[in-house]
Regions:
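Polysaccharide-binding and catalytic clefts of secreted carbohydrate-active enzymes
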Residues: 17-19, 23-194
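Redox-cofactor binding/interface segments in oxidoreductases and associated redox assembly factors
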Residues: 197
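Hydrophobic or amphipathic alpha-helical targeting/insertion segments
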Residues: 1-15, 56, 60
Length: 197
């Protein structure tokens, strides 16, 4: 048996209890419950609940003789779900930028923000690259994709760490989408034993 963590589709009761886990699209519209992959990788409340259910399932089945391997979540980025423009993502992105650049002047230089008067006075002014009148700054968009990829890696790593603790010796894989480019598959792969599609 390959056991899969049940985190790709948070149930309605959990969404109702922690609505901040829902993703937001680039126009600022909430991605509501009713399908799958409706969570935001930057939601700390969902990260906590994902760890909780992963721990419960791995504790219960981790040493069962029939369990040959584990799969984390399912199909990261299916339905264009890596990028979220939620308040959680905004806060996490600002922190990521502070860690990367240290000073907002360095960010402005790296992004060529003088063009079209896009300079920032502090990291607290930087939002995710929401849909704009025309194309947003390409350096801004690239950094947001790198940040978002790091959020997926963090989410996946949390699950692999728990599974390795509670189900030692079992391989861990992820069922990737074939042509997704919104996150770094190789970074995710560092925490896996196999990749599937």
């Amino acid at each position: 048996i390959v056991m899969c963590t049940p985190t790709a589709t948070p149930p309605k009761w959990l969404v109702d209890a922690s609505p901040d886990m829902l993703a937001v699209d680039s126009r600022g519209a909430l991605r509501r419950f009713g399908s799958r992959r409706h969570y935001c990788f930057s939601s700390e409340s969902y990260l906590l609940q994902s760890a909780r259910i992963t721990r419960e399932v791995a504790a219960r089945y981790g040493k069962h003789a029939a369990v040959a391997a584990w799969q984390t979540d399912n199909e990261y980025d299916c339905h264009d779900t890596t990028l979220s423009f939620s308040e959680n993502a905004r806060v996490a992105f600002r922190s990521w930028l502070k860690d990367k650049y240290g000073d907002v002047a360095d960010l402005n230089r790296a992004w060529g923000a003088v063009f079209w008067s896009q300079e920032y006075r502090s990291f607290d002014e930087v939002d995710p690259p929401f849909q704009t009148v025309t194309e947003a700054n390409p350096s801004h968009r690239l950094d947001y994709r790198r940040f978002s990829s790091d959020q997926v890696v963090r989410f996946n790593r949390q699950q692999t760490d728990i599974i390795r603790e509670l189900s030692p010796g079992c391989d861990i894989l992820h069922n990737f989408m074939g042509v997704s480019t919104s996150f770094d598959h190789f970074d995710i792969g560092k925490d896996l034993d196999a990749a599937s599609w």
